[in-house]
A protein has these predicted regions:
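Conserved N-terminal/central alpha/beta ligand/cofactor-binding core
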Residues: 196, 202-203, 208-287, 330, ...
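Beta1/beta-strand and adjacent pyrophosphate-binding region of the FAD-binding site
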Residues: 175-187
């Protein structure tokens, strides 16, 4: 079987370009499509600065150009995609427009990542230049470029791609050492876990796939904090969140609103925390039923590292670490008969709460234009349009998709709806003159997730635990949010069957409830904790525990428990069996500072249903 070799082929990763210009590094979907990539996220304005690099051609000859890309709108439209760009070789633009899509019989096939063929170039041995030139500012994307003398085309499957990468771009793994506690994911739960463990003396590795900390509460996603902290039975839990959480309420506000610097400053001040930002964990080494180490790939340079540890915590939200380690997970809705929950459906299904892709526009004094999405965008009219200036929580997509396998599609649909909505208001709305000076200021390209996989622990929290309530002897931090489940709006579902993008919340009140410790460690991976929305709960119970202040306190508990494990040479389950009093003592103390201003008074109760602020 013919294959590529470094003697006749040059492969260049887009994120490794010498100068990225105005292109954005996108690393959310490494586990689905095999790599981080460059995204032309210009929000409707073509990127001004190209991404450029210099390559070394090994020998004279004719080289065929291949570009790994995709047509991101092909899932929903047969029209010409706006996600197109050019590739320049030695300053000459290839005749092809890249990102136009794979040939296929279904929309899913046409929307897959593939190698698009360009022209053939006669190149001399030595240095040559490549450039990516965006054409629309609407999220064209490039993963890699190949120039080859070989008379074969690269395969499109993820398996073929991995083999190709290993052959042409082998990457050694740098060993970063052994830690007491390794945390994967630096959202609010991962941050609080790291801080709690570090302050009680554990050596912590905190691995985050993005360069910004905070997850959904970062300036990349912009979801406000919800839930209450500092509640009985352990009112000291939550002060860490008060240190790192923003002091302002609201979704989809300006970047400064989310005070990313507070999170980073506190983490960097902890001498026991080693922070690895931009790293996606993509592999584990097991020793029996214990995780021995994880490997991770960096988003921009795509170098690889290995991190070993004594205990680990999955704070990814998606249970990525758990799945790699072989832990049992759940996803979708459990049947009523499985746990006896009144709010569960009669039959189990794959439905989940969806993703919010936040955005907003602003009225300025200057007129502006925006590309008309009539050819490629969402089908909208005066009846279906939502002419708002801000997308809040109820702009929700992907409820019927696979939250893991379809993660990129779901995010893309959120952007697709945002662009289509704004384009309609600018170009076709009956009162479009009201939008003449309205600018689309910000559209997130990072998914604001609510639900995906949940890890099975020694106890699975159920609806009845929260509503009766049923207390447990190993209660820890307190959940206070009502059981808040989201469903597609009926009219939106009728207008866009299977592709809904508007939701409503269905609420069931609860009293404050202490989450059992047994929900915070995996049943079948001996040294793995979890904190955040991937803990051991049913779909129904997740409706309460998933909000970020509650997740943050879970992280604090897990950090304290990790310290007990490290100091007494235990595994997580051992704490429940024989050393829960040691954890209780630490939960009574908490790990947060009480000498900083207390700001977490806002949005302590669920305001689901309040939509007027966004119009």
């Amino acid at each position: 079987m013919a294959s590529f070799s470094s003697s006749d082929t040059v492969m260049t990763l887009a994120t490794r370009f010498d100068n990225l210009g105005d292109w954005t590094v996108e690393q959310q979907f490494v586990l689905q499509m095999g790599s981080s990539y460059l995204l032309a996220h210009g929000i409707g304005t073509p990127l001004e600065k190209d991404a450029t690099t210099t390559i070394e051609i090994p020998q004279d000859g004719n080289y065929a150009l291949y570009v790994r890309t995709k047509n991101w709108t092909a899932f929903w439209s047969d029209g010409k995609t706006p996600g197109i760009f050019q590739v320049l070789v030695d300053g000459e633009a290839d005749k092809a427009e890249f990102g136009t899509g794979k040939v296929g019989s279904t929309r899913r096939e046409r929307a897959q990542w593939y190698w698009q063929k360009g022209g053939t170039y006669n190149l001399k041995k030595g240095k040559h230049t490549l450039a990516l030139h965006d054409l629309m500012g609407l999220d064209g994307r490039c993963d890699a470029i190949i120039l080859t003398k070989a008379d074969i085309a690269p395969g499109d499957s993820i398996e073929e791609y991995k083999v190709l990468r290993q052959a042409l771009l082998p990457e050694p793994v740098e060993d970063k050492g052994i830690f007491d506690f390794v945390i994967v994911g630096a959202g609010m739960s991962g941050l609080c876990a790291a801080i709690a463990a570090a302050r009680f003396g554990s050596k912590v590795a905190l691995i985050q796939d993005r360069y910004i900390l905070g997850g959904n509460n970062s300036s990349e996603v912009r979801v406000g904090l919800g839930g209450q902290i500092n509640m009985a039975p352990y009112p000291s839990l939550g002060y860490i969140l008060n240190e790192i959480g923003p002091d302002r309420i609201g979704n989809a506000r300006g970047a400064h609103h989310y005070q990313d610097w507070k999170k980073m400053d506190v983490i960097l001040a902890e001498k026991n925390i080693s922070l690895f930002t931009g790293y996606t964990v993509d592999g584990v080494e097991m020793e029996g039923k214990k995780i021995k180490s994880v490997t991770a790939v960096e988003a921009t340079r795509q170098n690889r590292i290995k991190v070993s540890g004594y205990v680990f915590s999955d704070c990814t939200g998606d249970a990525h670490l758990a799945v790699m380690a072989g832990a049992e997970t759940m996803m979708g809705r459990e049947a009523k008969s499985q746990f006896g929950e009144s709010l569960a459906p009669e039959k189990a299904d794959d439905y989940t709460m969806g993703v919010s892709v936040e955005w907003y526009c602003e009225d300025w004094n200057t007129p502006c234009s925006f590309p008309d999405s009539l050819d490629w965008g969402l089908r909208l009219d005066e009846d279906t349009i939502e002419p708002v200036h801000r997308a809040n929580w109820y702009w929700e997509v992907g409820m019927r998709d696979d939250q893991i396998a379809d993660a990129e599609k779901i995010r893309d649909y959120g952007m697709y709806v945002a662009y289509s909505t704004f384009s309609y208001c600018k170009n076709r709305l009956a009162k479009k003159e009201d939008w003449e000076c309205t600018h689309l200021t910000w559209v997130s390209h990072v998914s604001g997730k609510r639900e995906s996989r949940r890890i099975v622990g020694d106890y699975i929290l159920r609806e009845q635990d929260l509503t009766r309530p049923i207390p447990h002897e190993d209660g820890t931090c307190t959940t206070t949010w009502r059981i808040d489940q989201h469903y597609p709006m009926e009219k939106n579902s009728a207008d866009y069957p299977g592709e809904e993008w508007m939701s409503y919340g269905k609420l069931v009140p609860i009293d404050p409830y202490a989450i059992p410790y047994r929900c915070l460690y995996a049943r079948d991976v001996d040294n793995m904790f979890m904190a955040g929305r991937d803990i051991s709960v049913t779909h129904v119970a997740l409706g309460s525990v998933r909000v970020m202040r509650t997740c943050a306190m879970m992280g604090e508990v897990v950090g304290l428990a990790a310290n007990v494990c490290v100091s007494k040479k235990l595994m997580p389950r051992d704490i429940y069996k024989t050393h829960f009093d040691d954890l209780v003592a630490l939960m009574k103390k908490g790990a947060g500072r009480t000498d900083v201003p207390y700001t977490q008074f806002y949005h302590q109760v669920d305001r689901t249903g309040h939509q007027a602020e966004d119009r």
